[in-house]
Amino acid sequence: MDQEQERGISRLWRAFRTVKEMVRDRGYFITQEEIDLSLEDFKVKYCDSMGKPQRKMMSFQSNPTEESIEKFPEMGSLWVEFCDEASVGVKTMKNFVVHITEKNFQTGIFIYQSGITPSANKILPTAAPAVIETFPEASLVVNITHHELVPKHIRLSDAEKKELLKRYRLKESQLPRIQRMDPVALYLGLKRGEVIKIIRKSETSGRYASYRICL
C-alpha cells in the first residue's frame, strides 16, 4: 500500500470516528468502544484484502437513548451511509431515499466523497417527513466541536425553549440567531425554530450561558 492510499484510509477512519461522535452528541446510542476503534482494527473491519476501503460496510443504524426519547419524543432512528461512488448521481440518491422511507428512519445521513449532482440534490426533499443530511467526507476528518475555541452547544427541547422564553419574557424573534448552515448547527442537525444553549467559560464567573435560535 502506497503512502497516498495509507493517508486516504487514515482520513476515512478519522471521518468515521467523527460521525460516531456526532451521532452520539445528538443523543443516539453509540458505545465508547465504537468511537475508540483503532486504525488497525478499522482496516481489518472495513478494508478488503488489497487494502481498499469498503464504504458500504461502514453504514450503520442508531437509535435514540432513553434519556433522549424523554426529552425529544419525536426523535426516531437514524441511518448513516458512506457512499462508495466518487460522484453521486440521481440513481444512488433515489436508492438512499427509498431505503430511508421504506425502513421508516427519521433521519438519513449521507456521506459522500467529492460531489453530489444538482439533480440528485433535488431528490432529498422527497424523503419527507424524514430528514436527509449530506456531508462531504473531508468536512468530518476533524471534529469541529473538539476545538478549544468552540464552546459547548446543547439543543433544547420544546418544553425547555418555552420555559426560556417565559422566564426572560422574550419572543422568538428577540433571540440571537444561528444559521442552519453554521458548522455546529449542521453537526447537531438543528432544524428551523430550535434553540441551542451555548456554554462558555468566563474569567470572572466561571461559566455563562447564551442562547441562539436556528433560522
Swiss-Prot record:
Signal peptide: none
GO biological process: transcription by RNA polymerase II; transcription elongation by RNA polymerase I; tRNA transcription by RNA polymerase III
Pfam families: RNA_pol_Rpb5_C, RNA_pol_Rpb5_N
Domain of life of the native organism: Eukaryota
GO molecular function, one term: DNA binding
InterPro entries the record matches: Arch_Rpo5/euc_Rpb5, RNA_pol_Rpb5_N, RNA_pol_Rpb5_N_sf, RNA_pol_subH/Rpb5_C, RNA_pol_subH/Rpb5_CS, RPB5-like_sf
Compartments (UniProt record): Nucleus
Keyword line: DNA-directed RNA polymerase, Nucleus, Transcription
Regions crossing the membrane: none
Gene Ontology CC, one term: RNA polymerase III complex
Keyword Transcription appears in the UniProt entry: yes
Annotated NCBIfam families: PRK09570.1
Family listed: Belongs to the archaeal Rpo5/eukaryotic RPB5 RNA polymerase subunit family.
Subunit annotation: Component of the RNA polymerase I (Pol I), RNA polymerase II (Pol II) and RNA polymerase III (Pol III) complexes consisting of at least 14, 12 and 17 subunits, respectively.
Function, as annotated: DNA-dependent RNA polymerase catalyzes the transcription of DNA into RNA using the four ribonucleoside triphosphates as substrates. Common component of RNA polymerases I, II and III which synthesize ribosomal RNA precursors, mRNA precursors and many functional non-coding RNAs, and small RNAs, such as 5S rRNA and tRNAs, respectively. Pol II is the central component of the basal RNA polymerase II transcription machinery. Pols are composed of mobile elements that move relative to each other.
UniProt protein name: DNA-directed RNA polymerases I, II, and III subunit RPABC1
